[in-house]
Curated annotation (Swiss-Prot):
<dbReference type="InterPro" id="IPR036259">
    <property type="entry name" value="MFS_trans_sf"/>
</dbReference>
<feature type="glycosylation site" description="N-linked (GlcNAc...) asparagine">
    <location>
        <position position="372"/>
    </location>
</feature>
<feature type="transmembrane region" description="Helical; Name=12">
    <location>
        <begin position="455"/>
        <end position="475"/>
    </location>
</feature>
<feature type="topological domain" description="Cytoplasmic">
    <location>
        <begin position="215"/>
        <end position="293"/>
    </location>
</feature>
<feature type="transmembrane region" description="Helical; Name=2">
    <location>
        <begin position="74"/>
        <end position="94"/>
    </location>
</feature>
<comment type="function">
    <text>Probable glucose transporter. Involved in sugar transport, carbon catabolite repression, and initiation of conidiophore development.</text>
</comment>
<feature type="topological domain" description="Extracellular">
    <location>
        <begin position="315"/>
        <end position="318"/>
    </location>
</feature>
<feature type="topological domain" description="Extracellular">
    <location>
        <begin position="181"/>
        <end position="193"/>
    </location>
</feature>
<comment type="similarity">
    <text>Belongs to the major facilitator superfamily. Sugar transporter (TC 2.A.1.1) family.</text>
</comment>
<feature type="region of interest" description="Disordered">
    <location>
        <begin position="512"/>
        <end position="594"/>
    </location>
</feature>
<feature type="transmembrane region" description="Helical; Name=7">
    <location>
        <begin position="294"/>
        <end position="314"/>
    </location>
</feature>
<feature type="transmembrane region" description="Helical; Name=3">
    <location>
        <begin position="104"/>
        <end position="124"/>
    </location>
</feature>
<feature type="transmembrane region" description="Helical; Name=11">
    <location>
        <begin position="416"/>
        <end position="436"/>
    </location>
</feature>
<dbReference type="InterPro" id="IPR050360">
    <property type="entry name" value="MFS_Sugar_Transporters"/>
</dbReference>
<feature type="topological domain" description="Cytoplasmic">
    <location>
        <begin position="340"/>
        <end position="345"/>
    </location>
</feature>
<keyword id="KW-0813">Transport</keyword>
<dbReference type="InterPro" id="IPR005829">
    <property type="entry name" value="Sugar_transporter_CS"/>
</dbReference>
Length: 594
């Protein structure tokens, strides 16, 4: 498979096969294509002459040609972000009630409705409505895809797998840039309707594919369906349900969930203002998502073609295509080092690199003024390209990785919903405000300022802030399980000490000793417990295996009553097949064979 060819190898001490989980995670990651493609198409469409001719409401640009008012272009771009913010907030109740997989299918259905409205739009109002509806679907996808990936992925490749969501976003941006180049010279409505309509193709493929994928084991444990969780995990790891490694992983997931439930019911108030470590995690996730936007990347992604055109750069469509190629290719190095370097180091290096590039662009533009525009454009293109490299290799994918890992199971969907919504709310502000930062007020008859390349002073300053924030607040979550991340937040007081964290107890041990009041792990008591001899550990595994077998047999016996009338000659084998089919059906009528 391609992912192994790129250099990732399963550790020798990991039982079974990770191939099914990797293939599932890679397919689900392509949900990012919807976001990337939609973002990329609007970047080029706003600069298309045919689009401006069809949708202009009387505005004349500096060249005396029909154009779009800044407030109108701001609405067209920003209302997608408004919709995504709404969708992100809806993702938690939907994902917890209907499951991650079914909610993703529903989200794609919403996106399809929005895309159809955009294709059929004949005025700005209908176009804005379509982008808002499509945004709701994308917002749900942006929460549930990383959540789905993190909950089903093996820990040794979890970060890399979640990074592929960002890779899919960049591939969508690149595809949109290619399509825009192929259609922008058309003089009919096909110039912009073809790029918009093409996104329906992959949306339908993704929705159909999701119907045959498994629900995540952690969600099934949260729902109380241990038998379905065992079967789902066995198919994702290619292990028998009684294999010690699978039993251990499933038991730890279940014990962790029982520990969280022992703390009492959760609410949005508890997530924000409850336990200190939970509030810290929420604050970390929200700030990371907001800082990702404040790096200024969507200034380039939304308005790059228009910005390069206003700066006097020749052939801005080709320059935007080059930037998207760099964006896509530069995401791949991040996949390689997200596990070996770790999340903290990669985020800090990326922020430092972006800050240097942006401040150099702004400083050179300020020093040169209106002189030597050719040299300014060369500096602009060069350092924007390097800046995109640093973003794509670090803050692009890694923010999604961290925010999908740091929350406990019982509030994971709610917390990711809040943090992702914070990303989209700020995305809306940037998308809406940018036209006013790049338009001459005399030409537009609106209150605006023409910062030009000096806007990079703003983005560069926030990148410097990002370096300090990562050092102080972001814990290192690589190479440990989602359940061990909970232990780390309980025990490690400062983020800069997190790289030295070593798990010392499990939630199974805590359950055996009894959860203490307030949910604080009985660390001292655990440390005082003598290590279990190998014979006792084996006996413990055998007991867990036996209990799983009993549970599954009971489940099978309840669902196989209708098969008892089969003949003695073939009844045994047929009943076994029937039982397995019905147990698979308990996962939601999905095919788990790989």
């Amino acid at each position: 498979m391609a992912i192994f060819a790129m250099g990732w190898q399963k550790p020798d001490n990991v039982a079974g096969s990770s191939a099914p989980a990797i293939m599932v995670g890679l397919f689900v990651a392509t949900g990012g294509l919807l976001l990337g493609y939609d973002t990329g198409t609007i970047n080029g469409i706003l600069a298309m002459k045919s689009f401006k001719d069809h949708f202009s409401t009387g505005y004349i640009d500096g060249n005396g040609q029909p154009g779009i008012y800044p407030k109108e272009s701001a609405l067209i771009v920003a209302m997608l972000s408004a919709g995504t913010a709404i969708g992100a907030l809806l993702a938690a109740p939907l994902g917890d009630h209907y499951g991650r997989r079914r909610s993703l299918i529903g989200a794609i259905g919403i996106f399809v409705i929005g895309a159809i409205l955009q294709v059929c739009a004949y005025n700005i109002d209908l176009l804005v409505a379509g982008r808002t509806v499509a945004g709701v679907g994308i917002g749900i996808v942006s929460v549930l895809v990383p959540l789905y990936q993190s909950e089903m992925a093996p820990k040794w490749i979890r970060g890399t797998l979640v990074c592929t969501y960002q890779l899919s976003i960049t591939m969508g941006l690149l595809a949109a840039a290619v399509v825009n180049i192929l259609t922008y010279k058309l003089k009919t409505a096909a110039a912009y309707r073809v790029p918009i309509g093409l996104q329906l193709t992959w949306a339908c493929v993704l929705a159909l594919g999701l119907t045959v994928l498994p629900e995540t084991p952690r969600y099934l444990i949260k729902r109380g369906d241990k038998n379905a969780a065992a079967l789902s995990l066995s198919r994702l790891r290619r292990l028998d349900i009684t294999h010690p490694a699978l039993v251990e992983e499933l038991a730890e997931i279940e014990a962790n969930h029982q520990y969280e439930m022992a703390l009492g019911p959760d609410s949005y108030k508890d997530i924000l203002f409850g336990e200190p470590h939970l509030g810290r995690r929420t604050f970390t996730g929200c700030c990371l998502q907001m800082l990702q936007q404040l790096t200024g990347v969507n200034f380039i992604m939304y308005y790059g073609t228009t910005f390069f055109n206003n700066a006097g750069v020749g052939n801005p469509f080709k320059i935007s295509l080059i930037m998207q190629v760099i964006n896509t290719a530069s995401t791949i190095p991040g996949l390689f080092v997200v596990e070996s370097w770790g999340r903290r180091r990669l985020l800090m290096v990326g922020a430092i690199g972006m800050a240097i590039c942006q401040l150099l662009i702004a400083a050179f533009a300020t020093a040169s003024g209106s002189n030597n525009l050719s040299a300014q454009n060369k500096v602009l293109i060069t350092f924007v390209a390097i800046y995109i490299f640093f973003f794509a290799a670090s803050w692009g994918p890694v923010v999604w990785v961290v925010t999908s890992e740091i929350y406990p199971l019982k509030v994971r969907a709610k917390s990711m919903s809040i943090t992702t919504a914070s990303n989209w709310f700020l995305n809306f502000g940037i998308a809406y405000g940018t036209p006013y930062m790049q338009t001459n007020s005399a030409a537009s008859d609106e209150s605006s300022i023409d910062l030009g390349s000096k806007v990079f002073f703003v983005w560069g300053a926030f990148c410097i802030v990002a370096v300090g924030f990562v050092w102080c607040m972001v814990y290192e979550t690589s190479k440990i399980s989602l359940e061990q991340i909970d232990e780390m937040y309980e025990r490690v007081d400062h983020a800069w000490h997190s790289r030295r964290f070593e798990p010392s107890w499990s939630f199974q041990e805590m359950r055996d000793l009894g959860f203490s009041d307030g949910g604080i792990p009985p660390t001292q008591q655990l440390q005082q417990q003598p290590q279990q001899p190998q014979q006792q550990q084996q006996q413990h595994h055998q007991q867990q295996q036996h209990q799983l077998q009993v549970d599954l047999q009971q489940s099978q016996s309840r669902t196989s009553n209708s098969s008892t009338s089969q003949t003695d000659t073939g009844g045994s084998n047929n009943t076994g097949a029937s039982q397995d089919d019905k147990l698979v059906a308990s996962l939601g009528n999905i095919d788990l064979s790989y």
